[in-house]
Amino acid sequence: SKILIVSQQNIAVDNVLNGLYNENIELFKDNSHSMVRIVSNENKIQHENIKQFTLENWFQNYKEMVKNRFYTIEQDKRFDESLENSLYFDKSSEWLNLIYKDDFKDIPNEIKELLISSHQILGATCMGLANKSLGLDLSEFDIAIIDEAGRATAPELLIPILRAKKVVLIGDHNQLPPTVDKQLFKDIEDDNIDKLTFEDKEVLEKSFFEELYEKIPNSNKMMLNEQFRMPKKIGDLISELFYESM
């Protein structure tokens, strides 16, 4: 199965991936499991364990593999000058020249997509998933797990939702609401776009998670019944005030 793990923030994505890695270190080491972390800058990754799984690092490994394979073919060509082997050598040479461009950003999206599709687990932020320069346009997943979904706006959530056959949303609309920079509204209106209506602003500011939670059947949602963040008396008070003592 192809699994997508996303959140609005990098730290949430990395916490999940780091937990998976620590629980399955041997499986990741022998490549029984594989993951790729999509991120614009490696410095945004919060856990050192996860930096080895960035798409750019996977690409560097792939280049070395292709280069070694090419040199093997080159050696074979010296002993076998058949037409078939010569054509194979020429195509391999073209492929090697293609992937050895100076900058990772110059690599065709088709190659990035090929690398991404070879992994079972992909981690990214909601907006990072929409980056057209990372070869994600055609990526599809069997399941998307979206953490901190209560903090994401409708556009942010729709990006991963539309990529997956099944979706698991994890969040709490009673906690932090979606974060939208107020300057965004001003910038949109300053760009000669029609003034934002109340409904437009509500779409950006109200949690899409809350909308879904209110409308889906009870059989499709559940609530955790255990917390570790606060003393029991405080937890009971919050449960009574915001969660109907559930």
Regions found by a protein language model. Give the residues of each.
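Conserved helicase motor core of SF1/SF2 NTP-dependent helicases
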Residues: M127-I146, G150-M246
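Conserved P-loop NTPase motor core of helicases/translocases
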Residues: K2-E140, T179-D200
